[in-house]
């Protein structure tokens, strides 16, 4: 059980991870949490916890520094731990920050826009951010962020995901599972994760092909067969008889049919043994957002209960709820900051505020509005509405501002030049060659 001393120490550890402009940055964290009605970056400075002028929020993001290694260590120190007999579920996904008209912002790449009307161009430009979180026991925004990094133009989201897994892998408890969306359907990622002490559960695309073990040599002339019969996700004629089949109930008590095939491989990595899982939900509407049939790939211990693993994939959707909370409530994509480095610092501020609210949810006394149910679990937005009283009890490690008088301003005759323009980076980086980890 988390108490006020734990949250107070968390605040001091976060403060220590700011090497420069730490007071302004920490004031920004408190202001972001305690101003639930704000709709822009300047508006959060009207919080009582932002002790500086409103322009200092931009100065802090421009001049401040955040030690990402120290911040990751703090996040992992306070991350939720699984109960005895339970697993730790880790989610990794990428989210885009659209900046189509920010020509003075560097390193913008193409982003895919979802849920658009037919005929609309589904491409915009901006930055990608890769986020690694601890998933909640049920899909909700109560995710705990472990790491959040910008995907630069010279790398890919898949490479960033592998790097994030390797950074945290040595700290993970046994039987931990990393859950990935269909965008991470990549043989290279499976090869890189095969030597790690963590299971990987990913969703598959319809075009993915697998092969069963090769038959024994026939003794005839020529090279023996390297692959067995084909299993193509989009072709039911290739399924044959699965190695196992079970009927289970999901978290809402609805029937789910699970089938699996073991000891499969892909042509690019025949040495890598994979399990393919088919999940059929008869109650689904069978639309693009709610498919009736889903296919998963499992890379990990073959002795694990496949049905439990397959049902656990639904926890991944909690990360989508977390993204929605960060963007709609914590204003993650609202500030129009010029440089990617400034927006990286803002992204870390949002991650700190998100985790702080999660740690403080059991310590906050929330005044519910008449239409809000007291029988439901408290949301992070409701925690924000009652965080002020807790912040008074915890105090702040940030030092008060020192008045310095008025600035001298620009020197006489100074020339303000036009900001540098940067083109959109369209070059797609190449994934390294497949090598066993």
Spans of features found by a protein language model:
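Alpha-helix boundary/capping residues
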Residues: 48, 64, 78, 313-316, ...
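Gly/serine-rich nucleotide phosphate-binding loop at the start of the catalytic core
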Residues: 1-64, 69-70, 75
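N-terminal cationic-hydrophobic initiation segments that often serve targeting/anchoring roles
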Residues: 33, 45, 80, 169-170
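Flexible, active-site-adjacent loop/turn segments at secondary-structure boundaries
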Residues: 55, 59, 95, 202, ...
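A common structural microfeature
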Residues: 29, 38-41, 54, 85-91, ...
